[in-house]
């Protein structure tokens, strides 16, 4: 029986490249001249710290970061940006987390979405991934289209296809 896994993974090398490109872009922008603004990638915590002098500039920096991530084929929904900014001294900062893996609540929503579609497939949660098994490839392709079309707030990839 054909099957595949639904996962949510981010290539950290691509994230590193996007952060480096955003930092390089920061040096060429005239509105950030002589302004202490920065991007810091923390690969252990899987987070990106964005810091600048004002909250408006932090929002601009986040837009630059999203643009560079999308050019590297990483969806903007892979970033979890908190509503509140940290303000210390004269710098504002935001610690944007990268979403890796499928949490159990998100996996349950995904399973419910697939089961409500009435496609003839079996769905199992296996740790931080979801396994989908069906009798035909057409059913599996229907599930893939359904998951791509659903807005679940997180990017999903499909891997481990078996016939």
UniProtKB/Swiss-Prot annotation:
Q: What's a Pfam family this protein contains?
A: DUF520
Q: Which InterPro entries match?
A: DUF520, UPF0234-like_C, UPF0234_N, YajQ-like_sf
Q: Which superkingdom heads the taxonomic lineage of this protein's source?
A: Bacteria
Per the record, its GO cellular-component terms are: cytosol
Entry's Gene Ontology molecular function annotations? nucleotide binding
Q: Which key words tag this protein in UniProt? A: Nucleotide-binding
Q: Which family does it belong to?
A: Belongs to the YajQ family.
Record's function text: Nucleotide-binding protein.
Q: What's the name of the protein? A: Nucleotide-binding protein Spro_1084
Q: Which organism is it from?
A: Serratia proteamaculans (strain 568)
Q: What is the lineage of its organism?
A: Bacteria, Pseudomonadati, Pseudomonadota, Gammaproteobacteria, Enterobacterales
